[in-house]
Amino acid sequence: MRNHAKISQVAHYLPKKIVTNDDLAQRMETSDEWIRSRTGIGQRHIVTGETTSDLASQVARKLLEKSQLDASEIDFIIVATITPDASMPSTAAMVQAAIGAKNAFAYDLVAACSGFVFALSTAEKLLASGVYKRGLVIGAETLSRSVDWSDRSTAVLFGDGAGGVLLEACEQPTFLAEILRTDGGRGASLTAGIDQKETPFSTQSCQQPFIQMEGRAIFEFATRDVTATMAELLEQADMTVDCVDYFLLHQANIRILDKMARKLGVAREKFPANMDKYGNTSAASLPILLSECVESGMLRLDGSQTILMAGFGGGLTWGTLLLQL
């Protein structure tokens, strides 16, 4: 008999320092009104000494505490991130060491703002195999270290944070449908972290450490391609938008959510948002949003609600999941 997987616990963690739009206006030519009207963002949390693995480890500890599990009972840890502490060891390996999950294998998954959705899909397959019983899936980012703080077109958008879930094997299906996609042909529209150095054998070099984005292209991609895939997902599951209690989307821009809701014919209230507090936290945005929705009582994790989750971003990548929570 095929095993299934369910989200049994959620948690998130934000660094303490808050940088408001007014704070940014003191550093560059911008204003709170300019940022809010174009993005819906009012502030963001920024690390001052913590690393991505520190944020992810805080989430892992919270998940263990909530579930009353010992770290030795975790079979695997997947961390979705584009801002790792180092190329190696992986951020997930650092988390494994930090919490003492001696029996868990751990690795990072890189899919930018789609990372958490891709990681959830991967983890569900691991549990469905019947080999593993439970794992931690975490999205964590310190994007403040990848931002050019003199470029207002990107500096105002991003923040730091982490969120995650405990995924456990179960008997009833809760992952109802999924569509994961990549279009590398459009990858140049959103890039970061390019660091190609000269060697004794090659004089080619290219360094572009900061996030660079073609804003209009990304907006069109999200509102056209991702929205169409969400509709396709519902059709695949033989469901309509009325069957979905909430749509949890990557928190990139309030205008994107507004246009998606209109195109799908869904009440905007079904699209919870927290970007006003945190900005765009890439792979961390969806698990942070999910955790806050559970904390507020909007979502119950009792199997009675259907949510559509969608991540989209660099790659270009996008992924959609239909979940029974």
UniProtKB/Swiss-Prot annotation:
- One Gene Ontology term, aspect cellular component: cytoplasm
The Enzyme Commission number assigned here is 2.3.1.180
Under Gene Ontology molecular function, one entry of this record is:
3-oxoacyl-[acyl-carrier-protein] synthase activity
Pathway the protein takes part in: Lipid metabolism; fatty acid biosynthesis
* Keywords from the named record: Acyltransferase, Cytoplasm, Fatty acid biosynthesis, Fatty acid metabolism, Lipid biosynthesis, Lipid metabolism, Multifunctional enzyme, Transferase
Q: Where in the cell is it found?
A: Cytoplasm
Q: Where is this region: ACP-binding?
A: 251-255
What reaction(s) does this enzyme catalyze?
A: malonyl-[ACP] + acetyl-CoA + H(+) = 3-oxobutanoyl-[ACP] + CO2 + CoA
Gene Ontology biological-process entries:
fatty acid biosynthetic process
**Predominant location category:** cytoplasm
| Active-site residue list | 113, 250, 280
Q: CDD domains, per this entry? A: KAS_III
Subunit annotation:
Homodimer.
What family is this protein classified in? Belongs to the thiolase-like superfamily. FabH family.
Known role: Catalyzes the condensation reaction of fatty acid synthesis by the addition to an acyl acceptor of two carbons from malonyl-ACP. Catalyzes the first condensation reaction which initiates fatty acid synthesis and may therefore play a role in governing the total rate of fatty acid production. Possesses both acetoacetyl-ACP synthase and acetyl transacylase activities. Its substrate specificity determines the biosynthesis of branched-chain and/or straight-chain of fatty acids.
Q: What is this protein called?
A: Beta-ketoacyl-[acyl-carrier-protein] synthase III
- Identify the gene encoding this protein: fabH
